[in-house]
Amino acid sequence: MPFEEPTKQDVQMSLGYGEQKHPVTGEPFFHHGIDFSVNHYLLSAVATGTVSAIGSDAEHGIYQTIRYGKYEVTYRHLSNVFANFSQSVKAGQTIAISGDLLHMEVRFDGEEINPLEFLTMLYGNIKALEHNSQMGINELDMN
């Protein structure tokens, strides 16, 4: 996961990707990411990448986008960022801290994808790296 789990308890996804009912208004809408119930968790880069955007807007507060090869991951509802625009980051490097929740969006080659697909791919790559490190191979290709 891109965040530390300080209590070693499972982190709950509070809102999934796709067609949803707004948690406050009850109105149907398309949710372009996933939300996690986290409170000021440290966020880490999931691979070597570059900060491609940082900003703030009224709806999502502070946000940061990291480009990992053909993947672009945007984290919203942040309380602070530690990696600056155009800065290179390495896997495991602390890049930001979440606010009361974390909203995550993912694009592959410019096309929006379900962030759970990205996280599932990451988990598979981590398992492969663990296996490969036993064989002396230490590369992760995000392209």
Description of each model-found segment:
Residues 1-62, 90-91, 128, 133-143:
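Surface-exposed, glycine-biased beta-strand/turn segments
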